[in-house]
Design a protein with these regions (language model features):
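Signature of exported/secreted
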Residues: 1-273, 277-304
Length: 304
């Protein structure tokens, strides 16, 4: 039944595809600063263009996302190859055709998982072809690549797993929202899942404060969201999980014991008259107090 349902959605998407003539181009820019004991340890920047094509028929909404140009840079430079590889895989994952919930606007199905998986398999084959097992250290490199690709392969095992992976990424997390389906926006508080940058995308439940206003400079509707959180609210399992990752990954070189986990999240969206975002700005501060800190700034700008 699952495959019949997927084929049904794919056929519908194909029938509607010829009506996708209203593509909107966005430029996404992300900056990440890592500090250890107050000292900057790394600084990275990624830039990417995404082309979004919306379509709806009655209460069914589809969105097609295509990737344009992508750039990455990082300091120290010896981390560039790893960043470029992650960026390349993110570009593959981002080329998604999705349906969204007609009431809430979040992604409820990825319609082209097979096509995305095929792109990943081609990318993976190219990576293996670059390794010569007979060369000095070639077998070690081969084994390391096996471990890496096994992790990535797991993201594509089925549609729910890939959808969870996709919606954990900032663009798909903050872009797909109630305004895409014309839902009413109002001042309120609600629960949402925050995916940790420091701790392997560990899901953490938090309360979001939302305010709706009019932007003074542009006159556009403005949606503002804010989270301030400390580890007093972490449930025991999540706190234990976070502490274990800290102990295994960070403490060997930081030395200091785990103190207190905090994060702050700021998210402003300007909505154009057609209901699509004109500009989205996200700021995230996440830390283990006094020991390690990550600062993320992310902007999505609609291009002319």
């Amino acid at each position: 039944m699952q495959y019949e349902e997927e084929n049904k959605y794919t056929r519908i998407l194909g029938e509607e595809e010829e009506r996708f003539d209203n593509a909107v181009r966005y430029r996404c820019e992300q900056k990440v600063i890592n500090r250890i004991d107050g000292v900057v340890a790394s600084h990275s920047e990624t830039q990417r263009e995404l082309i979004l094509t919306p379509n709806h028929n009655g209460n069914k909404y589809w969105f097609k996302v295509d990737a344009g140009e992508s750039f990455a840079k990082i300091s120290p430079e010896n981390m560039l190859a790893a960043l470029e590889l992650v960026d390349k895989i993110d570009v593959i994952k981002s080329q998604a055709e999705v349906s969204v919930d007609p009431d809430e606007g979040f992604i409820n199905r990825v319609l082209n998982l097979e096509g995305i998986r095929e792109k990943w398999e081609k990318c993976k084959s190219k990576m293996y072809r670059k390794i010569n097992p007979a060369a000095d250290g070639g077998m070690d490199e081969f084994r390391q690549l096996d471990k890496f690709t096994d992790v990535v392969d797991a993201h594509f095992c089925d549609e729910p797993t890939f959808r969870k992976e996709l919606t954990g990424k900032l663009f798909f997390d903050v872009f797909f929202d109630r305004y895409l389906v014309g839902a009413a926006l109002e001042d309120c508080k609600f629960e949402r899942t925050f995916h940790s940058f420091l701790f392997d995308q560990t899901p953490i439940e938090a309360t979001v404060t939302q305010a709706v206003s009019t932007d003074k400079e542009t006159g556009l509707k403005k949606l503002s969201r804010y989270i301030s959180f400390d580890d007093q609210r972490l449930i025991r399992y999540v706190r234990h999980h976070v502490m274990n990752i800290y102990r295994d990954r960070y403490q060997p070189f930081i030395k200091y014991n785990f103190t207190q986990y905090n994060f702050e999240f700021y998210h402003d969206t300007l909505l154009s008259e057609d209901g699509l975002p004109q500009d989205i700005k996200v700021n995230i501060i996440e830390e283990v107090r006094n020991n390690i800190e990550i600062l993320v700034t992310y902007q999505i700008r609609r291009l002319k």
